[in-house]
Amino acid sequence: MTFDDITGDGRLWAVRYDDANDNELFRLFDQWNDVMWLRKFFKENINDLNAYFKITDINQAISDTIDDSEVLEGVILDISPEADLDLIFRPLSNNRTIAEMLEKMKARGERTNRHDSWLRIYAIRLADGKYIITGGAIKLTATMQERPHTQAELDKIEKVRRFLLDEGIVDDDGFIDYISEL
């Protein structure tokens, strides 16, 4: 795996997995704007969409996803040097009590007038205001373990965390040293 510097200043990175054509952030935004991919996804997950969000119209779900993706993409990619990424990313676990080394984090789209956002971007926190994006998903259930596509995102974030630890990377300084040696 390699890492792409999204902001150009080392504050936001995205994983590019060995078998991937692009990094995870750009892959997600491409996917969340692909009507055919979204139609297939929502057809396969219509029961979850209805159970949690009370939406049965796949076209509405597609439209909401594309709209929400554009807003989230603007927030993530239009980050000014003064912007605080800690306001965008939150701990993955809603029950976290203390910060941990290489903490698992999430960013989500904003609530619309119709419903909460189901878009998630997952990341690892290197230090205050510095993150590595590991993936993302359309989350239609209460927990990530309930569906294979969100469980896969948990697996990816843990895989990246393990990779960093195996390379002796426990913070931003270690990550920058690692990147500079490549």
Model-derived segments and their meaning:
Residues 125-133:
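Active-site beta-strand-loop-beta-strand hairpin of nuclease catalytic cores
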Residues 1-76, 83-109, 169, 175-176, ...:
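An acidic, glycine-rich, mixed-charge low-complexity segment common to nucleic-acid enzymes
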Residues 111-113:
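Short Gly/Pro-enriched turn/cap motifs at secondary-structure boundaries
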